[in-house]
Curated annotation (Swiss-Prot):
Its main location: cytoplasm. The active site is at D73. One of its GO terms (molecular function) is uracil DNA N-glycosylase activity. It catalyses: Hydrolyzes single-stranded DNA or mismatched double-stranded DNA and polynucleotides, releasing free uracil. It holds the Pfam family UDG. This is Uracil-DNA glycosylase. PANTHER family: URACIL-DNA GLYCOSYLASE.
Amino acid sequence: MEAGMAEAGVKLEDSWKHVLSGEFASPYMQKLKEFLLAEKTAGKRIFPKGAEYFRALDLTPLDEVKVVILGQDPYHGLGQAHGLCFSVQPGVRIPPSLVNIYKELQSDLGIRPVKHGFLESWAKQGVLLLNSVLTVEEARAASHQGQGWEKFTDAVIRAVNDECDHVVFLLWGSYAQKKAAFVDQRKHLVLRSPHPSPLSAHNGFFGNGHFSKANAFLVSHGRDPIDWQLPDVVEGDKNLL
């Protein structure tokens, strides 16, 4: 699959390529490649674009991971998904779950909400913004579940667990919390709460203090904290011009 992905313009950062090479050689990844090709051949629009399937890994090398935030699958609206969970491209309306994440950041750390939903600055500091499923068909939520991506991203989580020390896993909602099974909590910190969705945020996401707890854990182990304050303006955000 790696060669096929390379032909599609996909990037995979070297440290990840090293630990995930066995996944790319596996039969399930070949089947996943065939599935995606068939979907595109049938004229279906797939999000994000091929070059951004592995954007979370590209922006956050394995040896730089400090925090892992797990999502389920990409946004399925036009122009939203770009390979980072919860994040949307510049100029796109901030989704409700991310609005609630911003509210908790303000309550927890006094972080000023911004008017965009572009989270790349977190990724570049070591926050792995990983969806469990890395593609989706336009307007069909969860349409690519069960095609192999889950096995791949489970391998990503296992790699972080095995290769890194003192990482914080923020597991929001029951789906993400299942991934705690791959994490050695003797060396990593797992924080659980309800999902930031408007359907569940008031049941314990608000007030969870996860962002301050994550930074306190990092500092206690000699790691630099995350600057959760996003830049006010990002390139390409027409809403802010």
